[in-house]
Amino acid sequence: MRRTKADAEETRQGIIDAAERLFFRNGIDKTSLEQIAAEAGVTRGAIYWYFANKTDLFMAMVDSVPLIWEDVIARAVVEDHPNPLALLETIALDALDLLGSDLRRQRIYRIMTRCAYQGDLARVRDRQQEALTRQRALFIAAFNLASQKGQLNPAWHPETAAHSFDWLFCGMIMEWLHFEQNFDLVAAGTASIQGLFAQFRSTAARTMETA
């Protein structure tokens, strides 16, 4: 029977899913293509039809989900936004909710935290670094805009506020992933972010949001 494009894509995705399960369970270095083929119910030759090697397969798995920083970048259109602090707070809380409920993202992100980014895998590290750099620039732009609008507490310098938020947001996510979810990301993260943004807001901003 002739295989359709949909059949081929289903097989390819099945291989990626099998690799994800084994990478998560055993680690990348301790997972062979033979094991992935057995897990996926295909031959090793079938894997080579879709992927050049294990590194290529790993890259396909990583590319199958956006980085959480990339999700933030896609939504954080802060230029001329009437309330940039509310925008950032909402985006951050939504990101925590998504990560806390999406088991597949959790597995892939945790696989990535265990990876030594050497050789061909360095491009994954470069992708993360690029996304983090862009996210930080957006945070700074948002806090600068909030300051210009009189919405940022004058006790905070915009860049200091942006860095503080960045370190809290990224740091708690990385700790949660690295140390195997040792706290409630959504509950603790929500309380921390809301508390920090309460400190960020000027009196005028708080009045505007409660009006």
Task: Tell me the role of every PLM-derived stretch.
Residues 1-26, 30-42, 55-59:
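Basic, helix-initiating cap at the start of DNA-binding domains
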Residues 25-29, 80, 102, 149:
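Short coil/turn segments at alpha/beta junctions that flank glycine-rich nucleotide-binding fingerprints
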Residues 41-51:
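Short hydrophobic/aromatic patch on the recognition helix
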Residues 67-70, 74, 86, 90, ...:
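Amphipathic alpha-helical packing segments from all-alpha helical-bundle domains
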Residues 97-101, 114, 118, 141, ...:
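Amphipathic C-terminal alpha-helical segment
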